[in-house]
Every structure is written in C-alpha cells, then in structure tokens.
Amino acid sequence: MKKLLWIGMLIVSLGARAQFDAAFTNTWALQSYYNPAAAGLDSKLNVVGAYSLQMVGYEGAPKTMVFNADMPLFFIGPKHGVGAAFLNDAIGAFSNKKIQLQYAFHKKFLGGRMSIGVRPALLMVGFNGSEIDLREPNDPAFATSDVKGNAFDLDVGLRYTYKQLWYAGVSAVHLLGPTVKLGDDKLHEVTVEPTFYVQGGYNLALRHPRYKLAMDAMLRSDITNWRGDINARLLYDGEKHKLYGGLMYSPTISVGLLLGFDFHGINIGYSYEVYTGGVGVINGTHEILIGYHHDLDVFKKGKNLHKSVRLL
C-alpha cells in the first residue's frame, strides 16, 4: 500500500513563503542552470535534460524535470553566451514551472575567464485544490478549486574559470523575491524567497593520462534553510568514449551513486540518492540525465574532440 505524502499541504500552505528550487543530484552537469554566468562558457552547444523522481513510494512526492541549453555567440564574439531553460516541478498538489532566458559576458582575467550573467524568467505556480480532501473545507489557507498564477523573476551570477582546471562561482536566484498571486480573485499567494548558491570544482589529473578525478561542491541557502552537495567522479577518457562513476554526499540529507558515459558528444547518466533521515533505502531518488554537446567554433582547426568544461 502506498504511503501518503501530501508534501504540498504539509510543508507549504497558500500564503506562506516557499523555497521554489528543486535539488538535483548531478549538479556538475547543470552549471548554467544554477548560475547564468556559465552560459556559453566554452565553444560548445550544450543541451542537457534531467528528470528526478524523488522519495519513490510516497504519493505526492516531488517529480522534477529540467531542460537547459546554452551556447556562445561566435558571430558577435566568444565573449558573449546565451541560454534558455524550462523547469517543471510537481510536489503534491502544487505545480511549479519556470521559463528563463540567460545572457553571460566573459572576459579574460588572470589567466582564466571572469563571467557575469543575468537571467530574466517567468514563474508559474499552480495548486490543484479540487484534488484535496480537507477535513475543514472552509479553511481559508487552502483554495478548494484549481488556481494558478505567474510572476516575473530575475537571477544573476558571477563565475571565475581557470582553464579546465578549476572554477568558482556565486549566484542569486529569485533576486526580487516574487510573489505569485493565485486565482482570479488573487486571494491566495506564494512568495518565493531569494536563494543564494556558491559553487566550486576542481579537476585532478591522475598518473594514468586517461583518468581524471572531477570534484564539485555546491552550497545553497535561502537564509532560513541550507543544503550542501559534494560529488566526486572518476573519469575515463577513451579515444571514442568516456565513462564515469562516482559518489555524492549531502550532509545530514543523503548519499548517492553516480554513473554515466559520453559517446560522440552524447552523455547519458543515472544516479540514485538514498536519504539518511530514516526514509528508507528503497524510497530514494532516481535521476536520469541526458545531454549533448557539439563544437560550434567554426574557426578551430582539427577534429571535434567534444571536450567540455562541464564534463571534465
């Protein structure tokens, strides 16, 4: 028998302040999603999609999908990058969507590249009140019908990348703290708190030239709550394909396993995240990652090696 978990009702009532952002395991592959300054950072068209099915076995548990693409604008100059993303997040009776465009400017600095990015977005929040059986049907905290609304949002980011060796960045999303008013009567609302991200990563070359150790870390906080994520992947760089396997750890929250491969610019990955708070091993999070990267630098000589700072 399925366990019941009305996350949307138990955690957030309409009129409360909600933490909007979903947590993905493969943060290393979604760098421009978390920080707009990473858009068009290398000479690639980067397309990635991730689907996360969290807390398997619980009804109403989060199901999140994100699609993100970015590229440099070579006809203007490699200093400019653009991107777009779409997020669809379902949590119990709530549905959250976000459509965003992003622009980044890159400048050579101290042997690396300093980047600054901005991302305007449209937030769309819905609440399926008709699907909820309330003990007190007249509770003003909840809508009893299906309601939805939208609001303008804005994200900004700053990042420094040193060759393909290491990077560090900070970003602020929901910078304006938008409030989404739901329904025609606007009686209910959801306020999205600003959230801040700090990211960093380092690629360590091993003795064998075909192996590398990629380490990434991210800390996110909306001032009230915080979450840290650390992952390490062992990469095998073959002549025609790449393989990786690794581990992730989020203090006080979860541990997980990462697996994947890259073949001619196509990356497919899988991760399983187990919660350490007593949820149960079989009630973890499955995440599927599918990506594609292709060299766009028409002035570069030689073969397309499909190398990307996101995958190394």
Regions found by a protein language model. Give the residues of each.
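Sec-dependent N-terminal signal peptides
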Residues: 4-13
